[in-house]
């Protein structure tokens, strides 16, 4: 069925699913180093999470987010995600989508967002 907006609700975005009339074109994506503090010492799951986040859809492909591996605290890895600045908005929504992709890419690792 069709979703009905309740009073006080508003549509934040639309997601189009299907095939276009023409083939889409690829676009450049940022590197892990451009959007994170990953080094040779950073856990591989963190890098995989960032790589997955870089594949997440963002408003006009801006990728205005960053991830920081903070370290360990109380036996848990800590990761910080930040939204960047954008003239067109949507960075908070983009950050949520990127964080989800990070979680999928990182796998079953015991970490927490800080």
Model-predicted regions and their roles:
Residues 1-114:
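Acidic, surface-exposed loops and disordered segments
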């Amino acid at each position: 069925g069709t979703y009905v907006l309740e009073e006080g609700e508003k549509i934040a975005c639309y997601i189009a699913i299907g095939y276009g009339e023409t083939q889409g074109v690829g676009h450049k994506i940022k590197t892990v180093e451009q959007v994170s503090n990953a080094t040779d010492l950073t856990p591989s799951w963190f890098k995989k999470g960032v790589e997955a986040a870089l594949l997440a859809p963002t408003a006009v492909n801006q990728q205005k987010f960053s991830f920081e591996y903070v370290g360990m605290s109380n036996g848990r890895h800590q990761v910080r995600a930040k939204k960047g600045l954008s003239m067109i908005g949507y960075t908070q929504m983009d950050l949520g989508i990127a964080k989800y992709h990070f979680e999928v890419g990182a796998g079953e690792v015991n970490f927490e967002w800080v």
